[in-house]
């Protein structure tokens, strides 16, 4: 443990106490510090986290405009590593600077799509988890993270679109696409979609066919119940780890299934790309509290009654 502490102290001094270091050396030292903490699974105490967050923020305020694309991405990645699973509130100070870095990255048409997506997910998560005011944070994320990322995808022509149209000669096929199928904890989206599936089963219609596409982790105890619904077809894409491969697989399956209406519920970069790919002729965003996605590929919003007034105040649903 003493060796770990000594190494950590050495890396800290290299990052923040070397007066002769330029911004490139400081950036590299921050990256090495974050890698060391992550690889050794070190849990930093709150006073240390507060010092680190303040030092990184000071560095970005002074030198953020000097960083190149690789360095901006490395800093975002380093903060994500230091942030870890404890989600200490001391990192909130970094939100404005990380948003600046992300918007700068998203404005670069030559930025690799994987880097843009990773940076989007990391900055989004930090902003969301550090919120104080739900309404203001939602608006901040929509305008400064979601929309720049959506515009970036438009500029790089990320549009492997499906061109199917709703057929009048078959059942209407509705697909719920969910990242984490769970009803445990505070994950409202999973509970909402689970309730909708139950409703479809109990009110079985000969004119509607229901699909459930699961793209991430699944609460195993839910599957036997959902699989017993004779009018719900489940497709699990969890084992496709590569995001590009998963998108292509989902796109092909949706086209083969002839999905008419796609309903999704999350803001992950992958979900934005699913919508951008136009997996169905009609696409909807199901909101369990977050303000509506204002991207052209979302045709309708499904909002709970108690959320409608709040959402309308931010962005009027079409």
What residue spans do the PLM features occupy?
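Short acidic, S/G/P-rich loop/turn micro-motifs used as interaction or catalytic elements
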Residues: 181-185, 241-242, 268-270
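A short acidic, amphipathic alpha-helical/loop segment
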Residues: 249-252, 270-276, 297
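Short N-terminal targeting/anchoring amphipathic segment
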Residues: 254-268
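Catalytic cores of nucleotide-enabled group-transfer and carboxylate-activating enzymes in metabolic
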Residues: 218, 227-228, 246-256
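Active-site-proximal region of nucleotide-activated glycan assembly enzymes
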Residues: 126-148, 280-318
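A short, charged, and often flexible helix/loop element on the N-terminal side
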Residues: 231-246
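N-terminal subdomain of nucleotide-sugar transferases
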Residues: 1-223, 228-230
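Short, surface-exposed basic-aromatic patches at helix termini and helix-loop junctions that form
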Residues: 225-230, 274-281
